[in-house]
A protein has these predicted regions:
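Conserved N-terminal/central alpha/beta ligand/cofactor-binding core
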Residues: 205, 211-212, 217-296, 339, ...
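Bacterial Sec-dependent N-terminal signal peptides
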Residues: 1-6
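Flavin (FAD/FMN)-binding glycine-rich loop and adjacent Rossmann-like elements that form
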Residues: 177-184, 225, 287, 299-302, ...
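Extracytoplasmic
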Residues: 7-183
C-alpha cells in the first residue's frame, strides 16, 4: 500500500520532472556515447543504481582517449550541465577523491571537476554554457585513471537539479529519452539466466539433450569468476562416483591452468565461448541483465533484460528457467524464498554455525597483480585519500589471492558497488604505499601495477530455498539421500576476517583466513536444485538450497559446473514429460539417473582438469 505522504512526495517529483522536457533539455546516457574512448562500460550494478555507466579504469594512469558523442540541442540558450556521478572513496576518506573527470562541451571544459561530492549516485550541478540550437559534442575527460564514473549528462535551460531518488531518475529518463522498446525474442524450452560456469554447463547439457535454450549473460564474457574479468581458478573434483560421467562437460570448457590473478589468456575465455557457439540449440544473449520477471501463477512466464549500453531491451519467454546468477536475482524477483547470512546454530543444529543468526557472509575478492619490469615507474601517492597503512599493516605482495577479501559485514547485493570499490581502494592504497612510503620502496622502483579487476569475485550472497536445505551434518556424518546426484569434494571452507585486520580496520576488513572442516566426497540431493516456491525454476551455482555452512563446500566452481550439468539434464526430463522440477524428484528420478550415468560431455577431447581438485593445502591455498 502506498501512503498519502508517499503520493504527495511522488506528485512533487513528477511536477519537478515535468520542468525538464525535450523542448528545453537533452539527456545522454554515458553508455550510449558514440565513441567510448578508453572508458569501460560497467554493468554490474544496474539493479542497485538503475543503469550501466562509464568507468575510468586506468589503474592510476589517466585515460588517453576521451569518450565523445554528439547531441542535438533543442533551442538557443544558457544551458546548465548536470552529471550523474558519485564520489566513490568518500565511504572511507574525507580527503580529495581520486575518481574525478571533466565534461567538455564542443571541446571546452565547463570549469567543474566531477565526482567530488556525494557518496551516493547523484546529479552534480556543473557550469553554464551558451549553446545554439543544433548539434554539439560532449566529451568525458578523465583526470586520474582512478575509476571516476559517469552515468548520464543533462543539458537544460531550467534551473533544476534532480534528487538522488531512483524513481525520479527513471521518470527523467522516460521524459527525455522515451519509453524503451522491448523486442520479443521468442519462446524457449529452457532459459538460463547467468553465464558463469554453472550457467554454461546447464545450457550445454540441456541443448545436447534436445532443448531449445536461451542463455542470458550480463557480461560480454562468459565464465563468471573463471573469466579473464575476475580471474579465479577452478577448484573441486569432477568425474566422481556415484555418477563418474558427470564432469566431462566441464572439461570441455575449463582452462587447463591453475591460479588466481594471472594473465587474461590464462582463463581461456574463447574456449568457453566457442563450445557454446557450437551448439545449434543455444541462443546466446551477451551483455543483458534481467530486470523484470513476468509470472503466470507460481511459474515464471518470461523475463525482460536490459542491454548493457541501455539502448535495447528484450523479452524472452520460456517453459523452464534456471537461476545461475550467483546472487539469486531471478529467484528474488520472482518471489522465491531466499536467505542471506549465517543461520543460528539451533536452527539446523550445525556445530560450526554461530549461536545467533547474523548477516555476515563470505566476502568478495578483487584480484590484482603487479610485475617487475626493467623500467622505473611512479605511482600516485594515496596519502590524502587512501587506506591508512604503515609498516605493520601493509601487505607488500605482488599479487592478490583469495584471502584478500572484502565486504563480509556488508549486504552483498545492496552494497555490491561499495564492496567492489573497497577492494580496488585497498589494492591501490597497498601498491601506492609500497611505491612511495614503504621502508623497502627501493625494491619497488621498477614494479608496475599491471592489472586490477573491476569485477567482483563473489563467494556468497542470496541462496534460494528448495525442497531440501543441505546442512553441515549432511556433509560431515555423512547423511545420504535417495536423490543423490553430483558430488561435492571440497572441504567445508569457511572464511572469517583476520583478527589483527579486524582490530586495525574494524568493519572494514580486507584480509581473511579459512577454517577447513574435512568431509568425505558427498553426493548432493537433487531437491537442493529447484525452488520450493517457483514451480518451473531450477538453480545452479552458489545460490542453491544450502545453509551458510554447507555453502563452504558446494560453492567452488567445478562443483557448480556439475550442478549445472545435472540441472540441464533435469530440465530435459521435465520437457519430455511435461513435468515440473519437483516432479523429477517424485516421479521421474530414474530418468534423471539414466542421464547422469551417461553424462553430456565429450570424451574425445583432451582431459585437462587434473589441477586443484581437492583442497588439502591449508591457509594460503589458491582458488578459495
Amino acid at each position: 500500500m502506498v501512503s498519502a505522504q508517499q503520493v504527495e512526495v511522488r506528485t512533487k517529483q513528477n511536477i519537478n520532472v515535468m520542468k525538464l522536457n525535450t523542448l528545453n533539455s537533452v539527456m545522454v546516457l554515458a553508455t550510449t556515447f558514440a565513441d567510448k574512448g578508453d572508458w569501460t562500460v560497467e554493468q554490474q550494478f544496474v539493479l542497485q543504481m538503475g543503469s550501466s555507466y562509464l568507468l575510468a579504469h586506468g589503474i592510476g594512469t589517466p585515460l588517453a582517449k576521451d569518450a565523445v558523442t554528439t547531441v542535438t540541442v533543442p533551442c538557443d540558450g544558457e544551458y546548465n550541465v548536470l552529471v550523474r556521478t558519485k564520489n566513490w572513496t568518500k565511504h572511507w576518506s574525507d580527503g580529495p577523491t581520486p575518481g574525478i573527470f571533466e565534461v567538455k562541451i564542443d571541446g571546452q571544459s565547463d570549469g567543474v571537476t566531477y565526482g567530488t561530492d556525494s557518496v551516493n549516485w547523484y546529479w552534480q550541478k556543473g557550469g553554464k554554457v551558451s549553446l545554439t540550437a543544433g548539434e554539439h559534442t560532449i566529451a568525458l575527460h578523465d583526470l586520474t585513471g582512478f575509476d571516476g564514473r559517469c552515468d548520464a549528462v543533462i543539458l537544460t535551460t531550467e534551473d533544476y537539479t534532480p534528487s538522488e531518488s531512483l524513481e525520479e531518475y527513471f521518470e527523467l529518463r522516460e521524459a527525455l529519452l522515451g519509453t524503451p522498446v522491448v523486442e520479443d525474442k521468442g519462446s524457449y524450452d529452457f532459459v538460463v539466466v547467468g553465464g558463469g560456469i554453472s550457467g554454461i554447463c546447464a545450457a550445454l547439457a540441456a541443448s545436447r539433450l534436445g532443448l531449445k535454450v536461451a542463455l542470458i549473460q550480463d557480461r560480454y564474457v562468459l565464465g563468471g569468476n573463471n573469466s579473464s574479468e575476475v580471474r579465479v581458478g577452478l577448484g573441486g573434483q569432477i568425474n566422481i562416483d556415484p555418477y563418474p560421467s558427470l564432469g566431462y562437460l566441464l572439461n570441455e570448457i575449463g582452462p587447463d591452468r591453475i591460479g588466481n590473478a594471472r594473465g587474461a589468456h590464462h582463463y581461456q575465455d574463447d574456449k568457453k565461448l566457442n563450445v557454446v557457439l557450437a551448439e545449434k540449440n543455444i541462443s546466446l544473449f551477451m551483455g543483458y541483465t534481467v530486470i523484470e520477471v513476468e509470472k503466470s501463477g507460481d511459474a515464471i512466464a518470461s523475463v525482460v533484460a536490459q542491454e548493457a549500453t541501455m539502448q535495447n531491451r528484450i523479452k524472452i519467454s520460456g517453459k523452464y528457467f534456471s537461476d545461475c546468477t550467483g546472487d539469486a536475482h531471478l529467484g528474488y524477483m520472482a518471489g522465491a524464498e531466499c536467505r542471506m547470512g549465517r543461520e543460528a546454530r539451533a536452527e539446523f543444529n550445525e556445530p560450526l554455525a554461530p549461536e545467533k543468526a547474523d548477516d555476515m557472509t563470505m566476502g568478495v575478492s578483487i584480484e590484482w597483480y603487479c610485475e617487475d619490469w626493467n623500467t622505473p615507474c611512479t605511482f600516485p601517492d594515496s596519502l590524502d585519500w587512501g587506506l591508512r597503512l604503515d609498516e605493520y599493516t601493509v601487505e607488500p605482495v605482488h599479487r592478490a589471492n583469495w584471502y584478500w577479501e572484502v565486504g563480509m559485514m556488508d549486504d552483498q547485493v545492496a552494497d555490491a558497488e561499495k564492496i567492489r570499490d573497497y577492494g580496488m581502494y585497498v589494492a591501490y592504497s597497498t601498491f601506492s604505499y609500497c611505491k612511495n612510503r614503504y621502508s623497502k620502496k627501493e625494491d619497488w622502483i621498477c614494479t608496475h601495477l599491471t592489472w586490477v579487476s573491476h569485477v567482483s569475485g563473489k563467494r556468497e550472497s542470496r541462496r534460494i530455498m528448495g525442497d531440501y536445505i543441505l546442512r553441515e551434518q549432511d556433509l560431515t556424518r555423512p547423511i545420504h539421500h535417495e536423490d543423490e546426484t553430483c558430488t561435492t569434494t571440497w572441504r567445508i571452507d569457511q572464511h572469517y576476517p583476520m583478527e589483527k585486520n579486524s582490530k586495525d580496520y574494524p568493519n572494514q576488513e580486507w584480509l581473511s583466513y579459512g577454517v577447513l572442516t574435512p568431509i568425505d566426497f558427498y553426493a548432493l540431493p537433487y531437491r537442493c536444485f529447484y525452488s520450493k516456491d517457483i514451480s518451473n525454476m531450477f538453480m545452479a551455482g552458489r545460490n542453491i538450497s544450502v545453509t551458510h555452512i554447507a555453502l563452504g563446500s558446494t560453492r567452488v566452481m567445478r562443483t557448480c559446473g556439475l550442478i549445472g550439468e545435472v540441472v540441464g539434464m533435469a530440465a530435459a526430463v521435465c520437457a519430455r514429460n511435461n513435468a515440473t522440477p519437483r516432479d523429477v524428484y517424485t516421479t521421474y528420478f530414474e530418468d534423471l539417473k539414466e542421464l547422469m550415468r551417461k553424462g553430456t560431455g565429450r570424451t574425445d577431447v583432451p582431459y585437462t582438469q587434473f589441477y586443484h581438485q581437492v583442497d588439502r593445502t591449508g591457509h594460503q591455498a589458491e582458488d578459495r
